[in-house]
Amino acid sequence: YQSGYAPRTIIDGAIRDRNFADNTVWMTFAVNTIIRELGDPSLLYETVKFNDTEEEYPVYEHIKRSVDFLYNFQGLYGLVRIWGGDWNDCVNYAGLKGKGVSVWLSIAWCRANRQFAEIARWLGKEDDARTADERGKIMEERIEAYGWDEKGGYYLYARTDDDIIMGGSDCDEGKIFLISQLWSVLAGLPRGAEAMEHAEEILETPIGIRLAYPAFSYQRDYIGSMAEKAPGVQDNGGIYLHPSAWKLAVDSILRRPDRVEEGLRKMLPFDTTYGVKCGEPYAMFNSYFAPETGYRAGTPGQSWRTASSSWMLKSVIEYVFGLHAELAGLRIDPCLPLSWTECSIVKVFRDCTYEIFYHGDGTGSDVLALSVNGKTVPADTPIAPVSGETLKIDVTLGKKA
């Protein structure tokens, strides 16, 4: 929309509007990814309509307005309002009065805003980039002041209309939520690694990492349908696989190959290394029921209709195998499990086929050497595509001294 707000769903060509606050934040991520894959920022000049106008505007203006909208969509303490839910659309009562805020969405906005600043600089729009930088600093200060739990050592999830904290160490239930900790790393916040350590201590189970803990045991009118589900089921403390996939990216960023392997094994339905899951061994699920569900533990919450598969694909290719698309080419910075001493992947990138072979010694996942068609190249340099050609790339992995 012209305001910068985006709808949640379009089905059969019809817009299905809902009062979820996070819809808009994903636009910048999508555009940034497409431009990096294509290597061509000219997409930003293409014009398209808003949903509520016949006049066309450049794609750049669309994402600028989306970032502006969320920054100005402020509730308590200047954080981003949660409205009728964020990514967790089952927290649908927390912000109906217009005051409740999502610490997670405020953190996610920081990542989107940083990407927008980069996009602005691609087009030489330095004033927009500087404004984004300044706003980013302001929002990060608010998050650290009003979204950090000093006692717990991690980030809160939300503050409701009546300023009831969700995801704080003094809460009786729902003391910690996973997604705030994950995105604090993705957004580059200063205490992200510390938050993740505390999150894993509390949330990890033999079949995956919980979305929240302890699960809510009774309905609460300031939360919503999350607290109406049985403890350990889906949003209410279940093993939700969207965040599990995000965690693969986070563990890769933090250079933790052992936890990457553990996370992959726990997500895959056929792997019983740490615990048994039930369901089709060839499908991805949205969640597993957590251990407190008793004999139902490991049962899928939903299969065949979930974004877990696409999130896992993105995390594995971009972060675990480390294939980072940049304007100049493909930068390789993996965090492979140490047991994967020999593996390979093929990626077609801008009409060029990259055949990439990884050779590890089991000591680490740092890139020690990189060669293209037998010629050594700097390990931290993007490899430019050659249209119509096949590049054979060898990556030597180990532990840097």
Over which residues does each language-model region extend?
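A general structural signal for short secondary-structure junctions and capping/turn motifs
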Residues: 17-20, 35, 60-61, 145-147, ...
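Non-catalytic C-terminal accessory modules of carbohydrate-active enzymes
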Residues: 201-202, 217, 229-234, 249-401
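Structured alpha-helical bundle/scaffold domains in large eukaryotic membrane-trafficking regulators
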Residues: 43-46, 151, 328
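Long alpha-helical scaffolds in large eukaryotic adaptor/regulatory proteins
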Residues: 38, 116, 120-123, 127, ...
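Aromatic-rich carbohydrate-recognition surfaces in CAZymes
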Residues: 1-78, 102-110, 237-260, 264, ...
